[in-house]
């Protein structure tokens, strides 16, 4: 109530100035929303998303494919066990590679721990470069380099993940509380001791959360890796698609969905453990 009376007690010109500021702010926000909406609408029109005729004409084909995929054929489930294990192993190994390399790169890619601005700039460029190349393209390159199998998938997932995981790790380091860091430096700690005892304990929960999230993502991405010859359940999926065994395709997709659900549930348990 007191704040209401204080506002009313202001001079008329000052009250009018405040209200005019509120009005200008509202119109500015409305204009920004309108610009964003216009850009989104233009993008949807450009890619044909607003072409209702094309979308409606495609519905019968989608219905036909869905009909041919029913009921799912699980008769070949025994041959999917090894590819599923390969997919899970690829996601775990790729995430492990990403975490190890990101721990090294992140400390030199964070402004408050980088030893020199030049080192910081090089590290950031490296992370941006790794992040800009899709893991699918990396998978194709590594398949050509080392052959078919799970290894090219692991290398592709690991290197691409370094770009994203390293970025998140570096941002977590940049937002640490500086008080413990300054206290450690004042006590005569070496730079390595500062990192181990003042910085790392603060960012460990964030690091764990990012690593778990990336593992979830890598499991999904590892199914796509198989489509370019990098092994895993995606390879089996592409084989069924090539020979138009849509019932088997539906079964494999359901198996992938079940595995993704299990991975998500397990990652949720891990997150609670690290909090």
UniProtKB/Swiss-Prot annotation:
The keyword Transmembrane applies. It holds the Pfam family BPD_transp_1. Residues 84-267 form the ABC transmembrane type-1 domain. InterPro entries: MetI-like, MetI-like_sf, PhnE/PtxC. Disulfide bonds: none annotated. It is a multi-pass membrane protein. Probably forms part of a binding-protein-dependent phosphite transporter. Probably responsible for the translocation of the substrate across the membrane. Belongs to the binding-protein-dependent transport system permease family. This is Phosphite transport system permease protein PtxC. It comes from Stutzerimonas stutzeri (Pseudomonas stutzeri). The gene is ptxC.
